[in-house]
């Protein structure tokens, strides 16, 4: 239910968002805009006795001349509330690529780094019902499915920090009304009127839909309905994964007969989860590529998807890392390899972690005894000193070394139910 109500009702609504398990330290991301300024002031009223310690951060992207003064505005207001504040500067824009996407990534990276430095377990973001509705409209334009139309989750984990959106049930107008009634200043970002951006187009389209009874409230309710549908689909995908898969040296083995009886949507979700877990891609593969991989699986053909090989013949379908995806990946000894592998062993002079490769596998006389196929092992992690192979634990050449998944095998299943 959306709220367009008074100050105390807003405070009560926010307090209820944290009543089950309030964090000891709660970060608040405040840009200086009306939504986030209102969030900061309302949270300060939620916890007046300091039962939850609030910390405020402002990300200054350095892209507009006004950004420094907006950060200063937040700093002054935070100080007036007795809250610590830090401005986080982004200097990574090179003028190339997608500015909005890069700025968003930088913003979340800076916020989670700041939170971890300050022992802040949870960060509150000021997305509103209007943001949710606009997101849904934009995703409709991309032919999104259930997960896309669920729009923004009220809670998710990123880089070890919980991000919460306690204002998804609150309208932008309600927050502005609160600020005006309390005489609290905020800054208006001129880009909010720039129709070059899809979000602003969606905002204008939303206003045009109002005569049909389609407003932020209705669309936010649709997003909530889709979120519940997504949870159900995730649950049945989880059950299918438990029933049909097992982990083998970081690869996923899938029982083909059971997979071919799954409903199309569950099969698609399971495929995407396996590929994402192994390949670690930031974005899911394109729809056409997914459809081709599903067709190959159903017809017992091998294929490639998202940096993974799918070996489709035999009693078990094997999903493994694709050699080409890790061919040039080299990190120092002690670092995480391919975003998932931790290798431990004796210190090696000039030690490096690389993909084993065909040449390296020739130096592993017992690799066939592992039961893993050639294609999987050449993309497995190994330890090198210059041109000398030191160890390849998954290929039967341990030499005192182990290779383990950073998150453990159980993460494959647990991550199906976490957003």
Curated annotation (Swiss-Prot):
Its EC number is 6.3.4.19. The keyword ATP-binding applies. Its main location: cytoplasm. GO terms for biological process: tRNA modification. Gene3D superfamilies: HUPs. It is found in: Cytoplasm. One of its GO terms (cellular component) is cytoplasm. Belongs to the tRNA(Ile)-lysidine synthase family. Ligates lysine onto the cytidine present at position 34 of the AUA codon-specific tRNA(Ile) that contains the anticodon CAU, in an ATP-dependent manner. Cytidine is converted to lysidine, thus changing the amino acid specificity of the tRNA from methionine to isoleucine. This is tRNA(Ile)-lysidine synthase. It comes from Ruegeria pomeroyi (strain ATCC 700808 / DSM 15171 / DSS-3).
